[in-house]
């Protein structure tokens, strides 16, 4: 995977947000950890499995964290339950959150509560399109932290409404609107 980094570093990581050319590159994981450590920032590490390399990805991330001796708080989140379970075996004392984009026939709200309980996940992150008062009540009764994300950034107004209903955290790609909250 490191073999391709020199090519990835050439990509303009800021263009998506700023709609113009920037000098923002895709940082290495170690660079992110160093920045977080220097600024005393905790981090959510989203496990995004590379098909066919899920185990290698998880092992590599755990190795970097251990080698770096990252001392800030962190937790792992993923839509991929298998990746979370693999990482939990390697780093059993870390915190974990299961991300849910939609309810399906093979995975219900009760299944999600059972999974969080079985694997001692501290958090469940829901797509804002599927979150409602009933989901929030059910999850809170399970003593699991609720986070919400959206394909588009949540507005401050949407976030305030979610927080008032019991959601504890939101994910955002661009937090500048939230600077003064």
Question: What is each of the regions a protein language model found here?
Answer:
Residues 1-103, 118-131, 140-142:
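Metal-dependent phosphodiesterase/phospholipase catalytic core, i.e.
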Residues 19-22, 98-181:
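C-terminal active-site rim and adjoining tail of enzyme catalytic domains
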């Amino acid at each position: 995977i490191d073999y391709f980094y020199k090519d990835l570093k050439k990509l303009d990581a800021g263009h998506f947000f700023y709609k113009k050319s920037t000098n923002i590159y895709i940082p290495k994981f170690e660079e992110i950890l160093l920045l977080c450590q220097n600024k005393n920032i905790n981090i959510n590490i989203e496990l995004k499995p590379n098909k066919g390399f899920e185990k290698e990805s998880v092992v590599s991330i755990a190795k970097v964290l251990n080698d770096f001796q990252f001392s800030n708080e962190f937790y792992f989140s993923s839509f991929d339950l298998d990746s979370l379970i693999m990482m939990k075996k390697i780093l059993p004392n870390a915190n974990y959150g299961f991300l849910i984009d939609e309810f399906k026939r093979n995975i219900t709200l009760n299944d999600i509560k059972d999974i969080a309980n079985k694997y001692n996940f501290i958090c469940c992150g829901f797509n804002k399109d599927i979150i409602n008062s009933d989901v929030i009540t059910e999850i809170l009764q399970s003593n699991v932290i609720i986070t919400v994300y959206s394909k588009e950034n949540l507005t401050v107004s949407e976030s305030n409404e979610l927080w008032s209903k019991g959601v504890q955290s939101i994910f955002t790609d661009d937090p500048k609107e939230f600077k003064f909250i």
